[in-house]
Curated annotation (Swiss-Prot):
One of its GO terms (cellular component) is cytoplasm. This is 3-methyl-2-oxobutanoate hydroxymethyltransferase. Belongs to the PanB family. It is found in: Cytoplasm. Pathway: Cofactor biosynthesis; (R)-pantothenate biosynthesis; (R)-pantoate from 3-methyl-2-oxobutanoate: step 1/2. Mg(2+) binds at residues 45, 84, 114. It comes from Shigella boydii serotype 18 (strain CDC 3083-94 / BS512). 3-methyl-2-oxobutanoate binds at residues 45-46, 84, 112. The active site is at residue 181.
Amino acid sequence: MKPTTIASLQKCKQDKKRFATITAYDYSFAKLFADEGLNVMLVGDSLGMTVQGHDSTLPVTVADIAYHTASVRRGAPNCLLLADLPFMAYATPEQAFENAATVMRAGANMVKIEGGEWLVETVKMLTERAVPVCGHLGLTPQSVNIFGGYKVQGRGDEAGDQLLSDALALEAAGAQLLVLECVPVELAKRITEALAIPVIGIGAGNVTDGQILVMHDAFGITGGHIPKFAKNFLAETGDIRAAVRQYMAEVESGVYPGEEHSFH
């Protein structure tokens, strides 16, 4: 199978073809996703909650991300593999570069970092040194203590304009992808149309170029609170492989996420 690349997603945006992505943390699920044609995966710091059982992503370490990245890469050798840099792993550009090198050696094609304009120098440093960067704006879970919980971001003109400004700044600095989490559909549309790079949404409506879900949400095995934007595809299909295919089909057709999964 031909490897999926950042250029593959850029072409999807140009062709207005929606694409699905998903989190993965181990060999077996990564192989299953790849076998079904789901070839863009994220080793997210969400593993702190879904795999390790913490109540936030904050305890996750670079070593944790590298371990799971290596496992996923073995299961999906041709996927486009993103890896989160966890909390406090990119407080300075130099620290970001050192930690990015660790997860890239483990098998990542790209690192994802949370934050806006304050990350411009970090994004420049990484991209100039051949480390592709995916930005992450909106609800950034590593900032949960500042936000006071998991809340929709970017409501109101001022907040929306700031997120758009952040997105443009990250793109100008060299970011090649952007994740938008828990923002109003109207703002997600503005940002997606303003950027040349692909935008991946989670809780941002069906107006972004791609979608991502935490795999546990997609299969209905999340403990505790279920996010509004989540959909249990396993409940509808009764089979994990069929659930993956259904998720991909609904994203590509624009059926998912629906109005019931979106914010305004």
